[in-house]
Amino acid sequence: MSFEDLGVSRWLSEALAAMKIHTPTAIQSGCIPKILSGHDCIGGAKTGSGKTIAFAAPMLTQWSEDPFGIFGLVLTPTRELALQIAEQFAALGASMNIKISVVVGGEDFVKQTLELQKKPHFVIATPGRLADHILNSGEETISGLRRIKYLVLDEADRLLSNSFGGDLERCFSVLPPSEKRQTCLFTATVTDAVRALKEKPPAQGKPPVFLHEVETVDQVAIPSTLSIKYVFVPSYVKEAYLNSILRLPQYEKSTAVIFVNRTTTAEVLRRTLRKLEFRVASLHSEMPQSERTNSVQRFKAGAARILIATDVASRGLDIPSVELVVNFDIPADPDDFIHRVGRTARAGRSGDAVTIIAEKDIDRIASIEERINKKMELLEEVTDDSVITDSLTATSVAKRESLMEMDKENFGEKRKINRKKRGLETEKIRVVKSKKEKSKKSLRQ
């Protein structure tokens, strides 16, 4: 079956062919015809299955028939995912002079305001930054959102969690009602909250919500080609054990993603491993967007062998050929563990995941093993004696120097200052907006 057989426009089918995409994947075959026929859609499929094209192809097909204003809005939880989705839309729509605006934190607010005022064809955004524009940038900026035809929630399970609730509500407040737009939710984890949306009665005059699942996290836990191992360590020497793991013969040349739970931990590890002469990059929410983008590009290009990341890198990001995943910290949610280790052993390739377990992590590990229905195996090559002999002293010195540098640079204070700056910028925008409204009122009088 071809994309044209699914109802995709010929120009778009040719664009896909130019990208060496000829045959629809299961999620694409299942969702594209239903979306084109007017159904709201819930699509569940694992990372790397082609979910973006599953919603982009029908949106672009229908947009090309009537390319007015802001046709579609895609909301996604992280800046990197927004940029990645925008790149795919731009590549697919290049021959049609498509205009796309990426609205994410860490980028120039005023520039984004001007872009939105020009009514691009598609807006790809994170909820927080779009909510800021809705609150502060005025009607001229957000008016185009009131007439969109499509709303997509990418990584919907994350977006529907409590952490995005207020921002999502504000975003929805300026969109057309559900009966006047199509809504598509795509995710690798079809949670109960997502699945419950299918049971809601459809809006008046609309067909029922369509649900299509293909190998979601609920259906496929861990690939058979993924080896999952652990080391049990005292919490105060985790970095030394990590150093030893990365120097094992089977891992010393592997591309690796190291997951941590906190941005401060990511920064400490980045500096420590760099002093130990590893080629590393980091990715976390406190970094400026330009640095985040540069880190991903360096890792993809092989300039950095190791990427240290918070969970912003656990979902959706197109990072091919990760050979090793290390959980330096244990996630609270077992599904986050599945997303993390899912960065490796993709498309039938083999991969390794090593989890560093400290004494406080036992309960979380039990929950993870129950969730994946599999016991982790001990990584026998890393022993207490080998760590003490080969890694402990050098790692301790490197970590101490890193902490001293961060203290000297007021790393924690900089984070507080940056947050205050963001708050001041928002307040300035409010003041400017208020003055404009007063000026308009006085002119009318």
UniProtKB/Swiss-Prot annotation:
Task: Kindly give the CDD domains that the UniProt entry links to this protein.
Answer: DEADc_DDX49, SF2_C_DEAD
GO cellular component terms attached to this protein's record: cytosol; nucleolus; small-subunit processome
Q: What is known of its domains?
A: The Q motif is unique to and characteristic of the DEAD box family of RNA helicases and controls ATP binding and hydrolysis.
Q: What is the protein's given name?
A: ATP-dependent RNA helicase DBP8
What residue stretches are annotated with the Helicase ATP-binding domain?
32-208
Q: Where is the composition biased (Basic residues)?
A: 431-445
**Chain ranges of the Helicase C-terminal domain:** 247-387
Q: Which organism is it from?
A: Scheffersomyces stipitis (strain ATCC 58785 / CBS 6054 / NBRC 10063 / NRRL Y-11545) (Yeast)
Q: Family, per the entry?
A: Belongs to the DEAD box helicase family. DDX49/DBP8 subfamily.
Question: What keywords are assigned to this protein?
Answer: ATP-binding, Helicase, Hydrolase, Nucleotide-binding, Nucleus, Ribosome biogenesis, RNA-binding, rRNA processing
Q: What is its EC number?
A: 3.6.4.13
